[in-house]
Design a protein with these regions (language model features):
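Flexible glycan-contacting loops in extracellular carbohydrate-active proteins
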Residues: 71, 192-226
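Localized edge beta-strand/strand-to-loop motifs within extracellular or lumenal beta-rich domains
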Residues: 167-181
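Secretory targeting and sorting signals
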Residues: 1-26
Length: 235
């Protein structure tokens, strides 16, 4: 950054705020993890500067110490969608920890990204059918989507415009009891009401795609582009 039980799913789709200059919601609580992604070339450990020691493992295909447009971060090369075999070296993973689960707390994920592509999962913990729920940010068609799936419902919110324009964008998705908000570059662009309920699973945080996939029955949804940092905050 230089510059676990069965549930009934009710999906609530985000309501886009168009033509508003509303500023992003206030910061949610305190940092849980801060991954600045400033490691040297060839590094295999992503350092957490948030103080909890939630360091990550950098896959061998991830380009560290990548400088572009005033920022140093990680580069994820494009891989052909749904083409086996899976490429786990394309991912950065952080082992499961209670602090990384949203639980029932206010919880926010912030990511700074730059891409010209239109596909892939940015960051997630868990997958669609796992016990305990999951969350993820993804960028289908260049539109950033944020999903939180919990014990009560699933709530989805989407950016109103494409962000795959080759520029750096800071995206923040926050889950509150009232619903989910999405901000882009400091401005709230969408909200979706609804309480997700508790989210707590035993999966790692994965950056750049899925950890459990085969590219045949389950696509790995590998991200292509650059990331400057990822930060998680909670109450």
């Amino acid at each position: 950054m230089k510059s676990r039980r069965s549930m009934t799913v009710v999906l609530t789709v985000g309501t886009v705020l168009i033509g508003t200059a509303a500023t992003a919601d206030a910061a949610t609580g305190r940092p849980v993890a801060v991954w600045e992604m400033n490691e040297r070339a060839g590094a295999r450990t992503m350092v957490d500067s948030g103080g909890r020691g939630l360091h990550g493992r950098i896959g061998r295909e991830v380009g560290t110490d990548t400088y572009v447009s005033g920022a140093t971060g990680y580069r994820f090369d494009r891989l052909e969608p749904d083409s086996p075999p899976p490429r786990p070296g394309h991912l950065v993973t952080v082992r499961d920890a209670d602090a990384l689960d949203p639980g029932t707390r206010d919880y926010a994920v912030t990511i700074r990204l730059r891409t010209t592509h239109k596909f892939g999962n940015l960051v997630q913990k868990g997958q669609a059918t796992v016990s305990g729920g999951n969350f993820k940010l993804q960028i289908p068609g260049g539109i950033v989507e944020c999903l939180f799936r919990g014990s009560v419902s699933s709530v989805l919110v989407s950016s109103p415009r494409r962000l795959n324009d080759g520029r750096w964008h800071t995206v923040r998705c926050a889950r509150y009891r009232e619903g989910i908000t999405l901000s882009v570059d400091g401005t709230t662009v969408a909200r979706s009401p609804g309480w997700t309920g508790r989210i707590a699973n035993s999966w790692p945080v994965s950056i750049g795609g899925k950890t459990s996939c085969d590219q045949i029955d389950v696509g790995c949804d590998y991200y292509a582009g650059d990331l400057d940092y990822v930060q998680i905050d909670s109450e």
